[in-house]
Amino acid sequence: MLGLTEDTFLLVASDVHSSDECFEKLEHIAGSTNCLAFLYAGDLDIENYFITRSVQLRNYVFLPVQGNCDNRWAWTDVNLDLPLYRTCEFKGLRIFITHGHLYCDPSSVGLENKDFDLVITGHSHRYNISSEIVDGKRITHMNPGSPARPRGCRASYGMVVFGKDSVSLEIRALEGDGLLAQETIAVDNASERHD
C-alpha cells in the first residue's frame, strides 16, 4: 500500500500545484490511522475545486504554509490559516516549516535555529535531506520535492516516521512506493517522548 507504515508518522509534501491526482494519493496516506499530521510546505494552489473540497472534508490534521504560488485569500474559504512559516512539535521533534521562497530557516524570522530539530522547505521541486551543526546541535533540513512537477528527479513526498527508538526521515517516490532517500535523526529526550 502506498507509503503506509505500522509506526506513527508525519506526511510531508509541497508543490502539488493543483494536481488532483497527486493530492488524492497524498490524502490516502494522510487518512491512515497512523498519520499524526500532514505538513504541507506550500504551493498547493487551492483554487482547484477538488483540492478545496478535499481540504474542507479532511479527516486528518493539515498544517500548511503559504508558497509563492498560493493565493492566501483563497484559503479563507476553507477556514485554514496560511502563514508564511509555522512551528510545531510532535513526539519531542521540534519542527520549522516554510516554503523556502522568502525564508529558509528559523533565524530568518528571528527564531533560534538551535531550537529546532527539523526544518522543512519546498519551492525547489527537488527532494533533499541534509544536516548541519549549529551551536553544537545537529539540525536536519528536509525538502520533500514535488509529487506533481519534479525538477530533475522523481515525483516525491516525505515521511517522518517515529519508530520505537528512532525518528526516520524518508523521501518516497509517489509512484512505485520506492524509498529515494532516508536519514535517521536523534531527538533530545527521545526516551521521554509521548503521544
Describe each PLM feature range.
Residues 1-3, 84-92, 129-135:
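Short acidic-hydrophobic surface loop/beta-edge motif
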Residues 1-57, 71, 77-78, 154-156, ...:
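N-terminal active-site segment of His-dependent metallophosphoesterases
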Residues 14-18, 42-46, 67-70, 100-102, ...:
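Active-site metal-binding loops of divalent metal-dependent hydrolases
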Residues 59-115:
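Helix-adjacent hinge/juxtasegments
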Residues 63, 94, 101-170:
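Conserved beta-sheet core of the metallophosphoesterase superfamily
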